[in-house]
Amino acid sequence: QHTLDNVHRVLSALRIALPEQVLNVKEIKLHGNAVGRGSKIVAKTELSTNLGYIKSDIRKTGNNITLTMSTTKLKVGELLSDKDLGSLTLNVKASGKLQGSTIRAISANGDIPSLEYRNYTYRNAKFNVAYNGTTVRGDLSISDPNIDLDLSGSAANITKMPATNFTATINRFCPQRLNISKKWDDAVFSTKISAHTNGKSISRMEAGLMVRDFQFKSATDEYSINTLDANISPDKIKIDADFGSVELNGKYNIATIGESIFGILKKKLPTLPGIDKKIYASDNRFTLNASITDTKWIEILAGVPFHSDQPINIHASIDDISRSINADMILPDFSYGNDRYRNGG
């Protein structure tokens, strides 16, 4: 067993910068052996540190390379200086093809018996991933009492014009029990999601989202969305769902579009609490048409105490550059918190 303090001091004196995380490794013990002949190499190591244990087996034959690695309660949180992360137990097998010193293709699969995050231990996760030089594909499944899901995704043309596809089947998701959020108390979520994107930058990206069979259940409430479809292009956003539809046309910045929409609400409902003064912080210029027939999702999912028994219709145009807002809002009868409002148009 050797201390790394002296190594750290020498490297510092030589002005060789190490990643900050390396300094969290205080003690290290390494056992290993390597043999090779011709194009065949076998290397086995057992690494023990103050943060945990890693065992690996690397084999190279010609241009092919394989890796088997396992960890037992490796303290990744301490290694990465992340207070939310705890320990990780991992088993992984990987294989790849080399071209010179560059890996041209690689695939890996493994299981995660346990991972601690925010004082919750996730169990029974499995994954696989593959990369062929242009496309990455991967799958993840978790079978845990408080999160049961299957994810699958791919990303193609990563260096040129990325195209991604993603699907998720979430059979059970309990945010409070996972210590992620207390917003919905003991609620359980389930849904099916698929999404795709095309484009290199958010401002020029085209994307689609499909949600099916969304279910929310808690001790006091239940809510479901059978279908939700969203399509996004550089000059248009269109959303169709059980609870209504929204269509936006024109120039918009996804990061500031919320400010512009709140500006519409502030102009038409200046006394409504919870809406700050409009801040013109962008160059958004668009028209908005929306028809909302069900507001229960606003109350339950967004946590906003807004309710209307009648349809809400909005027709608006906004130009942040000229600081102009024209809006026609039909909001006959609604409540916000304990206050009742009428003729909000």
Residue ranges and their predicted role:
Residues 1-345:
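Interface amphipathic segments
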